[in-house]
Regions:
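A conserved mid-protein helix/loop that constitutes part of the nucleotide-sugar donor-binding site
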Residues: 17-22, 166-185, 200-203
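Aromatic "clamp/platform" in nucleotide-sugar-dependent glycosyltransferases that forms part
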Residues: 220, 239
Length: 334
């Protein structure tokens, strides 16, 4: 059986760690390969088992980490290596990159060390391809997934939208500051907004919400199913979002997601999720006003199996490619 070493340098509870748990525990994937999760030091990815048949990087890409990536490639010249890009996207680059040339040089240099690069959404893959950051013939798209079966048992929301949930890490990326400002402009006393999550922006968000009793902070959702069950609508005003796992979870739970028009969220709009076209307080206030009071139920509720199958099929296809062609130990040309 194939032995796959998934390297991770951040074990903070979140989407990536839950995704790796899914890969490690899924029985169908387990029939093809033994997926092992290896925690490594930031910028120093060592300790890969000598008998690993394939190495998969879920590591942060940075200039500080590039020498470690080069060393990893040098130590495993005959082993196929894959990088999964969880962090960077077009939306991220637009808001956080001051030197486009330098940033793109970093990505090209890093990705060239790997036999395959996995994007987590079609939108992210399109950005990588358009900018020549990864060779198209080495680029795959595999959406991340977690176990969604518990969400299928949640009853669909009945009646109009009244209880809105914002689920995720409390930081600038998620756009929750803009959401609070927009929500406070909606003059509906029966509408509530509950945040599920923790993060560095908590104090800032509490200050923005002060004086509006409709806005609540519930902390980290130990039981995500309960958070979805207690809501009529989920909102994702993200400034950038390579994929957006919360949208998949909400849809399986029968909830629509009001979302930003960025990155991987665009891939999930066809499931019946309305998009807010502009990243402004005014646009979000208008969207919230229009959706409040409307029927809450998602018209076409996806199954956990359908979303799970897309991820598993992607990995099966990727492993077939890697095991049926010689590993390319030499660097790709950018």
């Amino acid at each position: 059986m194939l032995k796959i070493a998934h390297l991770i340098d951040d074990t903070t509870a979140g989407g990536v760690t839950r995704y790796l748990d899914f890969l490690r525990q899924d029985p169908r994937l387990g029939r093809q390969a033994d997926h092992q999760v290896i925690e490594v030091k930031r910028n120093r990815p060592g300790g890969v088992p000598a008998d690993a048949d394939i190495i998969v990087s879920h590591l942060a890409v940075s200039w500080a980490g590039l020498p470690g990536m080069i060393a990893l490639r040098a130590r495993h010249t005959g082993t196929p290596m894959v990088h999964v890009e969880h962090s960077y996207s077009e939306g991220f680059a637009a808001l956080n990159v001051t030197s486009r040339t330098r940033f793109q040089c970093l990505l090209r240099s890093t990705y060239s060390l790997f036999d395959r690069v996995v994007a987590v959404s079609d939108a992210q893959a399109g950005w990588l391809a358009r900018n020549g950051l990864a060779r198209v013939d080495t680029l795959d798209v595999i959406p991340p997934m977690v176990d969604l079966t518990a969400l299928e048992d949640i009853a669909a929301p009945e009646g109009p939208v009244r209880k809105i949930a914002a689920i995720g890490r409390l930081d600038r990326q998620k756009g929750f500051d803009m959401l609070i400002r927009a929500f406070r402009l909606v003059e509906d006393p029966d509408l509530t907004l509950t945040f599920f999550g923790e993060g560095d922006a908590r104090d800032e968000l509490l200050a923005l919400a002060e004086g509006d009793s409709r806005i609540r902070f519930a902390g980290f959702a130990v039981n995500p199913a309960a958070a979805y069950a207690g809501s009529d609508l989920v909102v994702m005003p993200s400034r950038w979002e390579p994929y957006g796992l919360v949208a998949a979870e909400a849809n399986v739970a029968g909830r629509r997601v009001l979302m930003s028009c960025v990155d991987g969220l665009q891939d999930q709009a066809p499931r019946g999720n309305p998009i807010v076209g502009e990243p402004t307080v005014a646009a979000w206030a208008d969207a919230l006003t229009r959706i409040a009071g409307r029927p809450a139920a998602l018209a076409q509720r996806p199954t956990a199996a359908s979303l799970r199958n897309e991820t598993i099929t992607g990995w099966e296809r990727l492993l077939d490619v890697l095991t049926n062609q010689p590993a390319e130990a030499t660097a790709q040309t950018a």
